[in-house]
């Protein structure tokens, strides 16, 4: 029986845990909040509380699991400030033993802006936002820790995640504007169930050992095209259009950071080398499955 530990068992982690349970694995789900622990328990996953924002103390210790026998997934985002990831540092300090593999969920944001150009895993990261820089620092920390401990690792650079309860339906209902189609630039995304499939492959494939893997559907549709497709399929009004400059002037810095960069992310390592068959490479199919 495989042993799985999911640190940060939230939106993606719950689905990943369910997939592993269906394959007969034992699954531990780690979360920092009580409400999340309830969701983990309801999913049939063993819940464990671990506050990575606080130093170790009584009642806030690393999970008591057989780390040596486990595939460990780390899905916790870095804190919203700083240049490093103290949450990850506390986690790695609490791991006793040598997991079979450590899989870290990072972001394609580490590549920065390429003006719509194509990037793959050999592209030198050039993060433009503090959030992406913290992710890249975390990747470096994972690599250093794994090398020192002799642990297999895989970094998944994940594009924007959509799925059930993660479609912009309320935005469309509010009539919020989108960038004019002629000014909208390529973006990248992945349906959550395909992300789970990628996570499973990253945990077990020999071709994922000590590798970085991009996770996206390869569609490169702009944010505007995505909104238009969601509106059409969900039977909602299409959004009004504004210029790119007007959108930048009205959006928060955080929101604009997702639209101000453009790149086409190559996913051939995922689909050809790891052999992941994406169920939702067609956006329309993915959107319908997410409603």
Q: What annotation goes with each model-predicted range?
A:
Residues 63-104, 140:
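NAD(P)-cofactor binding segment of oxidoreductase domains
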Residues 140-164:
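Conserved beta-loop-beta element that borders a ligand/cofactor-binding pocket
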Residues 168-190, 194:
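A conserved pocket-lining segment of Rossmann-fold NAD(P)-dependent short-chain dehydrogenase/reductase
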Residues 136, 149, 161-174, 201-213, ...:
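Glycine/proline-rich active-site loop of Rossmann-fold NAD(P)-dependent oxidoreductases
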Residues 248-277:
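Conserved C-terminal active-site "lid" loop/helix of NAD(P)H-dependent oxidoreductases
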Residues 198, 205-255:
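Mid/C-terminal beta-alpha module of Rossmann-like enzyme folds, strongest
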Residues 90-130:
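Conserved Rossmann-fold NAD(P)-dependent oxidoreductase catalytic core, especially the SDR/UDP-sugar
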Residues 281-291:
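Amphipathic terminal alpha-helices
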